[in-house]
């Protein structure tokens, strides 16, 4: 019977599931090479609520067998940046059509126009600055490829130096010339609107984890009034922050070239450390996606409109719609590049090793054995543990996550299923394409028809690559799931 424990009632011993350090050690290779030794313990009789602690006398943590996914082709960084730059130029071109379109087909009695655009109204210096900002990633990839270090011939080294010098000189000269003209032509408010995103760049991409490791800000915060640093030292700290932020940004700029690795180990502390590193890396990639997408949409949709004369008419609704289309399309393309199939599989492996805990009502398991949670143990599936005055049930094959850590729960939720990110991107890109097709069929304006038709081509290519990866990986993971089910049945 349930109820409160009286003074004469026998108290069961609650031994930990495993001794500290029994699950340590790391194993390389593709699968976990050892399993955690099961520990015998007593269980109470169930209270009839459906919750029960499994018999641990014969339980063994089943070793994970990771799926071997095929090597999918990964686009080279410079080719991807060229493709992204081309898509952004198309979006910028169709927006200029929306703003500066003419009625060239009208009869001569109306104001004559021999071209489809009012080219005399376009500020080509503003167009040059916008193009350079949109092509910053492509320019950076060219400079990176031309800055390769290694054993190269004299002719190749001279060619790479000339390429790097030409690209940087042409970009710098064009940017300085256009900015000088803009400073002479427009007001300070217009220039502030033009440069506003770059002022928000450093605060958004601030190095939270790396700065805590280097104790850059904690050292300044711990100083007393008499130990205040000088202005030069503060400027050096800011320059160090700027340099480290730019270093991390350029590292994430070429995602597939700097892919982290997975250590298939059985040490709980090492697994949690690996998950923390992967969380930081994933957050950096998502920040890069968000910043690049918003920056592209801002300079494609908002900047050309801001510098238009007040007497000039344009379709404001279409400009806002173009902002959403460019931001979503750019986000999907960047996520497809920065989160390839191998990276998503890496996150899935780490989530499988981490495990997850489900919070249960203590009243429903008052007569079920509850082990005190310890961080040195790997807990098998179905075990109840007590942590921070709450009761949790193990969900994964084996679990080393901290039960009260919400970030561990989120990590396991997003990456426990390896195709979840790919499915989200596929649905998002498919929804954008369906909306564009609907807008194309219902549009009665020639400039919108041309704009939607051109933007659709870039989305078609991204959707094709996502669908190809989804079909191939779906077959691979379904075969692995059947094999894992047979292995679990053999162990049980």
From Swiss-Prot:
Where does the UniProt entry place glycosylation sites?
A: 8
Topological category with respect to the lipid bilayer: Multi-pass membrane protein
Q: Does Metal-binding show up as a keyword for this record?
A: no
Region spans: Disordered = 1-54
Q: Where in the cell is it found?
A: Endoplasmic reticulum membrane
Matching entries from Pfam families are given as: Tmp39
What InterPro entries does the annotation carry? Uncharacterised_TMEM39
Entry GO terms, CC: endoplasmic reticulum membrane; membrane
Q: Low complexity bias located where? A: 31-54
Transmembrane segments in this chain: where? 77-97, 115-135, 153-175, 185-205, 288-308, 322-342, 421-441, 447-467
- The source's domain of life comes to Eukaryota
- Keyword field: Endoplasmic reticulum, Glycoprotein, Membrane, Transmembrane, Transmembrane helix
Record function comment: May protect the cells against DNA damage caused by exposure to the cold-warming stress and facilitates tissue damage repair during the recovery phase.
Per the record, the similarity remark reads: Belongs to the TMEM39 family.
Protein name listed in UniProt: Transmembrane protein 39B
Question: What gene, per UniProt, encodes this protein?
Answer: TMEM39B
């Amino acid at each position: 019977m349930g109820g409160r424990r009286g003074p004469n009632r026998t108290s069961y011993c609650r031994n930990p599931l495993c001794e500290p350090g029994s699950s340590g050690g790391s194993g390389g290779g593709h699968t976990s090479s050892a399993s955690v030794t099961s520990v015998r313990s007593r269980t109470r009789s169930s209270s009839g609520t459906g919750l029960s602690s499994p018999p641990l006398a014969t339980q063994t943590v089943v070793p994970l067998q990771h799926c071997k996914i095929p090597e999918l082709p990964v686009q080279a960084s410079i080719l991807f940046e060229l493709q992204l730059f081309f898509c952004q130029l198309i979006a910028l071109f169709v927006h200029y059509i929306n703003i500066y379109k003419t009625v060239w087909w009208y009869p001569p009695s109306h104001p004559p126009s021999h071209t489809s655009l009012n080219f005399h109204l376009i500020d080509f210096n503003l167009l040059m600055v916008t193009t350079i900002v949109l092509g910053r990633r492509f320019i950076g990839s060219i400079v990176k490829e031309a800055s390769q270090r290694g054993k190269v011939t004299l002719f190749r080294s001279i060619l790479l130096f000339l390429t790097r010098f030409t690209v940087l000189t042409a970009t710098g000269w064009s940017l300085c010339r256009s900015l000088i003209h803009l400073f002479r032509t427009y007001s300070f408010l217009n220039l502030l609107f033009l440069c506003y995103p770059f002022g928000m760049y450093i605060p958004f991409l601030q190095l939270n984890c790396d700065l805590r490791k280097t104790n850059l800000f904690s050292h300044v915060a711990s100083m007393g009034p008499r130990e205040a640093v000088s202005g030069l030292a503060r400027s050096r700290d800011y320059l160090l922050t700027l340099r480290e932020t730019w270093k991390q940004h350029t590292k994430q700029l070429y995602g597939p070239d700097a892919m982290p690795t997975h250590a298939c180990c059985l040490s709980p502390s090492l697994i949690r450390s690996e998950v923390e590193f992967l969380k930081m890396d994933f957050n950096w990639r998502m920040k890069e996606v968000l910043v690049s997408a918003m920056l592209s949409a801002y300079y494609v949709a908002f900047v050309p409109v801001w510098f238009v004369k007040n007497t000039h008419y344009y379709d404001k609704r279409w400009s806002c719609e173009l902002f959403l289309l460019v931001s979503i399309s750019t986000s999907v393309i960047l996520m497809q590049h920065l989160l390839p199939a191998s990276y998503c599989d890496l996150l899935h492996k780490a989530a499988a090793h981490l495990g997850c805990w489900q919070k249960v009502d203590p009243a429903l398991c008052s007569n079920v054995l509850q082990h005190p949670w310890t961080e040195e143990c790997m807990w098998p599936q179905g075990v109840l543990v007590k942590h921070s005055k709450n009761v949790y049930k193990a969900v994964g094959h084996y679990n080393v996550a901290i039960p009260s850590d919400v970030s561990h729960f989120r990590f396991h939720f997003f990456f426990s299923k390896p195709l979840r990110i790919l499915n989200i991107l596929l649905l998002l890109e498919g929804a954008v394409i369906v909306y564009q097709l609907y807008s194309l069929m219902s549009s009665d304006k020639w400039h919108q028809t041309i704009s939607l038709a051109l933007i659709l081509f870039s989305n078609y290519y991204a959707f094709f690559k996502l669908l190809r990866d989804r079909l191939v990986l779906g077959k691979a993971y379904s075969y692995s799931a059947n094999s894992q089910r047979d292995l679990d049945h053999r162990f049980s």
